[in-house]
Amino acid sequence: MISETGELLRTMNVKDGFAMKFAIDNGYKIGIISGGTNEAVKKRLNNLGIDEIHLRSHDKIIHFNDIIKKYGLSNEEILVMGDDVPDIPIIKAAGVGCCPQDAVPEVKAAANYVSQKNGGDGCVRDVIEQVMKIQNKWI
């Protein structure tokens, strides 16, 4: 849908939001690198406690590398989720690359984990829950 001002409206899954907030509250750092331009999405993510948000990204690997340098991380310490061709370089660069069930075939082929959930339908929750369960940090 498009708003009266011509802005593309997006929905966000409440369960995804809970999982992101829960992860942040438990010491995980979440960053967003998106080609999108929706400031309402940015506001929602800020409200969840995400402050590393890069919109209008045309070359995501640049922001990926900036985040790694900023926080003194190695590629192996990063988990990335993506669903389309522009995400492939960062999926391949990360220690773990994930995608939703409805990602394009090229992304699925590059990913280490394909969620059974579609994007916007609890995929982020699925991935965060899997990681936190493995680390004995889930509820």
Which residues fall in each region the model found?
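Active-site neighborhood of HAD-like aspartate-dependent phosphohydrolases
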Residues: 1-29
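Mg2+-dependent phosphoryl-transfer enzymes with acidic/Ser/Thr/Gly-rich catalytic loops
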Residues: 2-4, 13, 54, 61-139
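Conserved short-loop catalytic and cofactor-binding motifs
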Residues: 7-8, 29, 33, 48-52, ...
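Gly/Ser/Thr-rich beta-alpha loop segments that engage phosphate groups in nucleotides
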Residues: 8, 33, 37, 84, ...
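Substrate-recognition element of Asp-dependent hydrolases with the DxDx(T/V) motif
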Residues: 20-44, 55, 91
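PIN-domain endoribonuclease scaffold, especially VapC-family toxins
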Residues: 42-51, 56-62
